[in-house]
């Protein structure tokens, strides 16, 4: 895609603060390391600002929310807003939890650089009909035409913010650009945490000076292309998980990986 430039090699080993869930934190940490940056996970309100102030990007994931974690998230998001720290918010579970949906809407006031979610989560957040259950998207929610128009309107309300919507076709929407991307494989749904990983990789690319739109396109494409390189015939879940992380560390050596992105960018 001509709109994107290769972010590798990573120019500086940025510290990425991930406020995420206990299920996927190891995968996120290893994924960030595979790209050449450093992860830290701190969600105790007593220390959260110490780590956020040292970081070059903040990733907030709402999985496994608690009252204490919510307090820490609000503290970190406020600091990110006041200090212009790039921030990604992953709206996990807003289709089911009114607490999470309310929190995400509050976090919009802190102007995250990227707001991420699956098709059902984002449809729920912007007030469209959805069929999401738990933290999973529904196959019934993959219609993009109505969602795209609403997101364009939201981008005018929240200038400078990009939306990253994951699905069979990934949507990235900003004030002036829309990308529809088509890389990936169904096997990524075999293991938990791959959606969370996209958010963490987005934070990595933000830490390198990419815009929200660029970082979102790079992150979702990088993971999807890495997964496409894996031969999955006869492969079990644990082997596939291992190979995903393995390919994340190898793909950055390919100077032409951007040429394998499938999709279009529209102005």
Curated annotation (Swiss-Prot):
Enzyme class: transferase
Superkingdom to which the source organism belongs: Bacteria
Pfam family, one: HK
List of residues binding ATP: 116, 166
Amino acids binding substrate: 41, 193
GO BP term (any one): thiamine diphosphate biosynthetic process
Signal peptide (UniProt feature, chain positions): none
Pathway listed: Cofactor biosynthesis; thiamine diphosphate biosynthesis; 4-methyl-5-(2-phosphoethyl)-thiazole from 5-(2-hydroxyethyl)-4-methylthiazole: step 1/1
This protein's name: Hydroxyethylthiazole kinase 2
Taxonomic source organism: Streptococcus pneumoniae (strain ATCC 700669 / Spain 23F-1)
Gene from which the chain derives: thiM2
């Amino acid at each position: 895609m001509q709109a994107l430039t290769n972010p590798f090699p990573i120019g500086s080993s940025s510290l990425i603060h991930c406020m995420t869930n206990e299920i996927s934190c190891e995968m996120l940490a290893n994924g960030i390391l595979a790209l050449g940056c450093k992860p830290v996970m701190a969600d105790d309100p007593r220390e959260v600002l110490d780590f956020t102030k040292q970081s070059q990007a903040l990733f907030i994931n709402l999985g496994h929310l608690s009252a204490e974690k919510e307090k820490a998230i609000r503290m970190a998001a406020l600091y990110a807003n006041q200090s212009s720290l790039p921030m990604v918010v992953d709206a996990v579970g807003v289709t089911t939890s009114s607490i999470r949906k309310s929190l995400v809407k509050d976090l919009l006031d802190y102007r995250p650089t990227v707001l991420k979610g699956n098709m059902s989560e984002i449809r729920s957040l912007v007030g469209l009909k959805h069929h999401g259950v738990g933290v999973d998207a529904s196959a019934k929610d993959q219609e993009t035409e109505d969602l795209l128009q609403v997101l364009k309107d939201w981008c005018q309300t929240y200038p400078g913010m990009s939306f990253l919507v994951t699905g069979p076709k990934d949507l990235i929407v900003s004030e002036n650009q829309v990308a529809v991307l088509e890389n990936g494989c169904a096997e990524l749904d075999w293991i938990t945490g791959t959606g969370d990983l996209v958010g963490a990789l987005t934070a990595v690319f933000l830490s390198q000076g990419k815009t929200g739109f660029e970082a979102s396109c790079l992150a979702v494409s990088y993971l999807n292309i890495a997964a496409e390189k894996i031969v999955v015939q006869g492969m079990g879940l644990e082997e596939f998980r291992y190979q995903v992380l393995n390919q994340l560390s190898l793909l950055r050596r390919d100077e032409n990986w951007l040429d394998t992105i499938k999709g279009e960018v529209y102005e």
